UniProtKB/Swiss-Prot annotation:
The keyword Nucleotide-binding applies. ATP binds at G30, L31, N32, A33, Q34, G35, K36, S37. GO terms for biological process: DNA replication; DNA synthesis involved in DNA repair; double-strand break repair; SOS response. The gene is recF. HAMAP family: RecF (MF_00365). The RecF protein is involved in DNA metabolism; it is required for DNA replication and normal SOS inducibility. RecF binds preferentially to single-stranded, linear DNA. It also seems to bind ATP. GO terms for cellular component: cytoplasm. NCBIfam families: recf (TIGR00611). This is DNA replication and repair protein RecF. It comes from Thermoanaerobacter pseudethanolicus (strain ATCC 33223 / 39E). Its main location: cytoplasm. It is found in: Cytoplasm. Pfam families: SMC_N. Belongs to the RecF family.
Length: 362
């Protein structure tokens, strides 16, 4: 799988243009704030249906305009696939695959497989549990077909349960709560099991990568909501989650929120026996984040039997020569997009200069 060409119109600061890419390593260079990251963002948008920077869809429109449109031609097994994403202010976004409009962003997942590496990856390690849950959910959604559906159903039931908790406090009967609990357990257990299985694979990869890069040990600790060391048996997880919800009802009623479930979970990356978020140096944390992203790439490649497209947004300047060489070696043979302020010291198959939103192929 690789991106043959990209067409952008009114996307961020990028000028209206069509760009053709190489199958191998594509280097995009230029001064800061010229549009390098925006180019990668447009490709990632066609892959995941949202900005990797956390921007709202309306913020992707060029200043002074009222719409944007992005289109890519993807080559997959010698067949071309067209993916389009359009959005006009105050209207619904329109996403098409081969000319057919899709109903939801979830249908887009898997059409263009990408892995994004950026300096913000460090936040997965350094920030709070919500960052790690969001990252985990994003990764699993691409390789597990039903994960996003289960997550959406769980969140909808959770929201209704929390509303009910407030109503019970105001005098409504508790009897309906059991119905919500049964539904919450049904979807929650599936989420927990899929997270457990995914993190097992992450641990295998991270152990290998960290040992090869810096000769350090690593493990993943999944802080699941049911208190199990191994939460891979769905029936056991269901039973434990149901027990936890019942036991916690008084606390839930006190705070009007559900205190137990996948929405409160976390995972730790342990380096040399210590929690990397708390005790590791920034250099170690950056290496841990790099290994996490390399693991995402390996799992995606294995589970889909496809070649993901790699997007490296200004990460080369963050890596020393040893880590830079290691990353490029692992990504050899895959279409890769690299942004940097200079093309020096970077070996690519195609070079593009970006200035004021104009992409010029050399």
């Amino acid at each position: 799988m690789y991106v043959k060409e990209l067409f952008v119109d009114n996307f961020r600061n990028l000028q209206k243009q069509k760009i053709e890419f190489c199958e191998g390593i594509n280097i995009f260079y230029g001064l800061n704030a010229q549009g390098k990251s925006n180019l990668l963002e447009s490709i990632r948008l066609l892959s995941m249906g949202r900005s990797f920077r956390g921007s709202k869809t309306t913020e992707l429109i060029k200043f002074g305009e009222d719409y944007f449109y992005v289109k890519a031609i993807i080559c997959q097994e010698n067949n071309d696939k067209k993916i389009e994403f359009g959005y006009k202010k105050n209207e619904n976004k329109v996403i098409k695959v081969n000319g057919n409009k899709i109903k939801s962003t979830s249908e887009l997942l898997g059409q263009l497989l990408t892995v994004i590496f950026s300096p913000e990856d460090l936040n997965i390690i350094k920030e709070g549990p919500s960052h790690r849950r969001k990252y985990l959910d994003s990764c699993i959604s691409v390789v597990e077909k039903n994960y996003l559906y289960n997550l959406m159903q769980y969140n909808k039931i959770l929201m209704n349960r929390n509303k009910l908790l407030k109503s019970i406090k105001e005098g409504k009967s508790k009897s309906i709560l059991e119905i919500f609990d049964d539904q919450l357990v049904e979807y929650g257990a599936k989420i927990i099991v899929m997270r457990q299985n995914y993190l097992k694979n992450v641990e295998i990869n991270i152990k290998k990568f960290l040992l090869e890069i810096s000769n350090e040990t690593a493990e993943i600790v999944y802080l699941n909501s049911v208190g199990l060391k191994d939460a891979s048996d769905e029936e056991i997880v269901k039973k434990r989650l149901k027990e936890k919800l019942s036991k916690n009802i008084d606390v839930d009623l006190r705070y009007f929120t559900t205190q137990v479930g996948p929405h409160r979970e976390d995972f730790k990356i342990i380096i040399n026996g210590y929690d990397s978020r708390v005790y590791s140096s920034q250099g170690q944390q950056r290496t841990a984040a790099l290994c996490l992203k390399l693991s995402e790439f390996e799992i995606l490649k294995k589970e889909t039997s496809e070649k993901p497209v790699l997007l490296l947004d200004d990460v080369m300047s963050e890596l020393d020569e040893n880590r830079k060489k290691y990353v490029l070696e692992r990504l050899k043979g895959f279409q890769t997009f690299i942004t940097h302020t200079t093309k020096r010291y970077l070996k690519g198959d195609c070079y593009f200069k970006i200035s004021n939103g104009v992409v010029i192929k050399e």
